[in-house]
Amino acid sequence: MRKILVIRFSSIGDIVLTTPMIRCLKKQIQDAEIHVLTKKKFANLYKTNPYINKVYEYDDSLKKNIEELKLENYDYVVDLQKNKRSVRVTRALGRPHASFPKLNFRKFLLSTFKINIMPDVHIVDRYFKAVEELNVRNDFYGLDFFISDKNNFPISELPVEFQNGYYAFVIGGTYKTKILPPVKIAEVLKKINKPVILLGGPDDVERAEEIISLVNGQRTTDNGDINSQIQKDSQVFRFSDSQ
């Protein structure tokens, strides 16, 4: 058995983008046991993944995590975060390891000065660079997203007008530059001839109410427990941030 630790602390979109590599690790390495270290608030994204055997949650004490991880005696560590915390963990474990080309400076040039020298390589394929030494290759089966049975939200519980299909629109985002203004969202919604469910968190309630008032709508949800199921069942899923 080969025991492998994958480090990815955040965030939702980036975590989902790690799933092809994790699946291929599990399926292409015989008797592989896959562990993940991630932030506590994102742990459920990995806990529902059948290709992962164990999830370690980082909250406040990286020292505690390191002490626990040392006991696992990993055969290999895959750093998909590549920041100060993940490097600290990798060095402390002292096991064979690899990372991926993060290209931070190139991303800075693109986002700040609009100078695009980014390679034409998808981030998923860049993640696979970290496991080349293990002879793991992309199977091109796409991303994985697994929903816990306890979060299943039957469409029958929605109003009748939603049961023949609906669109879902995520109105929040990690950064202000990734959040569409309510007026712009309302403009989009007015062009849609299907019922729409607005999705977000507690910080998005006020924004949702403004959007509803602009389009004369009646319903919204900010319940994170059912967001994933609503996204999955929607005919069209729109967002401005990565999800």
Name every feature range the model reports, one short phrase each.
Residues 1-243:
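Catalytic machinery of carbohydrate-active enzymes
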